[in-house]
């Protein structure tokens, strides 16, 4: 991979992505021109029009009191990148969009484990979107830009990290697909990894974020291959060559423009002497405590042992209490992993493929449109569904291609779910990420707006947490949506998997052993080598998220984990089906929404001047009305009668049956003038009773003497001129004409016309 010095001190390297018949994409990395005071700054380009600046900086002194690595990732979306002015009141960018937050998480997940352990200097990576071609997504380019700027910054970073989006289109995995190409994809994956091995030829997958597309069921029905576990595993392998090319380009740039790695003070969690002392004091008691099945009881006992250890060693290691706590945690991790690898048993007594006790229930919140409670062991999730008019869809003001969102999934994780105290209020990045994962899992099975003309808000309340509340949210949401009457194309369930690996000595030989865990606990998530969440129907995967701490997972191990996840998913789906397997009747508290179509040229008439007509229909019927630009009208009401009344009035305007001469109506006076009274016959259709016709043969001087606005008048159409103007005459009341009426007189049109 060559590097070009395009001017003094400005270097550029290029990665070419070859997609065969789908064409090529070019990713360029440039260093030395912009943000030169940052420790490392790189401009990344995707083809010619998408441009990102990533700047990495580090604090001069470490935060010694921190017991974690203070890495911050920020993504700044600039609206000028798309040639737009922000839609906020102040017309400038404010809090980050959901897309920006999710991109921050995509960058953080592979970058964080690539820094040397024990680093306590604050590190900040800021990615600014400077220009964006609307046909492209910027998130994957941001991963590469962040890695490249960090790689040249002189920080102790074991990169570079390459990130790629691959989509399965017409049977081929296409890298860096356009938004238009994604519409034809059945599956979409963001994969990040780095090159490993002595010769740096292997690629270790570090992070995966994947989903089936919104059109997957229609595409599969049309002959496309379903995204099964086997297909997903093939996609991960297909991503590796692209990642290698991106890593090579970044490494070449770092070779030309990178700084020497500086010396940074490292703060190991504990010293070897502390660990040895903790292990000698606590191993026996801790091993016994880790066999307690209940989370609270187990945590109480391990906390007691920790206090005993601190008391016994406090004098010996005065001032190093934090090291004692860290060593105790490390010992706990070792014992948990040891038991899994040697005995194939876990801290709660389960085997490696066992799922905790499952429970599913619907209709748990009285007035909610749909609700459900899903429990898996000590993880407890309540799902609540709310239905409303499509106009209540979320409007999105970001750089992404999505401008509105009809299905909104919100995830809440209150501190009491883990028995702790903490801040409540606006969602944190983790909550936004978990909600987005659950949302992606369900979008492929949602009905279209034509099939189900509602905006849907799904809220997942994590009431208890001990392992994968995000996958519990998928299960609770499926149950809740069905309870609300949403006709899902298929039910979806999710499960969290884990992986533990180590070198085990057997008969004098050392071998690498991998054990995949089904339905991991919170502790197994923290102490394991992989966190792998998988959601899907009984037939295919709808969403997948993977993070690993290992330098590569053998493909057969990953394939086995996917198959193990499917077995668990099928088991959970069977339990869910016992609670509800088809959509329920809609709640009486949910609005009844109907759609009708009106000619586009009639939209203005339905709305009326300054909204007068549509507002009057809303006031008279109590229905909510929303009109789209294509003439689709959504009518919502608390009952069917109100909705039908509104539909009748709209149809009378937009799809009218033109009145004929001789028809009679019971109309309402809507306006009086010096020359007569205007009478409303149908919505949007008025006629004039001339003043000379108002006196029933007698002369009147003032229209208001005989007709006031709001009066009901029985009228007959006397004439319709070539401009459509209607002339009316009064019809004698029945009491006045009953004696003279012939036997075959026509029925009053007021009872037959509309």
Swiss-Prot record:
One Gene Ontology cellular component annotation held by this UniProt entry? cytosol
What the entry lists under InterPro entries is as follows: ExoRNase_PH_dom1 (IPR001247), ExoRNase_PH_dom2 (IPR015847), ExoRNase_PH_dom2_sf (IPR036345), GPSI/PNP (IPR014069), KH_dom (IPR004087), KH_dom_type_1 (IPR004088), KH_dom_type_1_sf (IPR036612), NA-bd_OB-fold (IPR012340)
Instruction: Give the catalytic activity.
Output: RNA(n+1) + phosphate = RNA(n) + a ribonucleoside 5'-diphosphate
Under Enzyme Commission nomenclature, its number is 2.7.7.8
Annotated Pfam families: KH_1, PNPase, RNase_PH, RNase_PH_C, S1
Residue ranges constituting the KH domain according to the UniProt record: 591-650
Record's CDD domains?
A: KH-I_PNPase, RNase_PH_PNPase_2, S1_PNPase
KW Protein biosynthesis (keyword) present: no
Q: Which residues bind Mg(2+)?
A: 525, 531
Give a short account of what the protein does.
Answer: Involved in mRNA degradation. Catalyzes the phosphorolysis of single-stranded polyribonucleotides processively in the 3'- to 5'-direction.
Name of protein: Polyribonucleotide nucleotidyltransferase
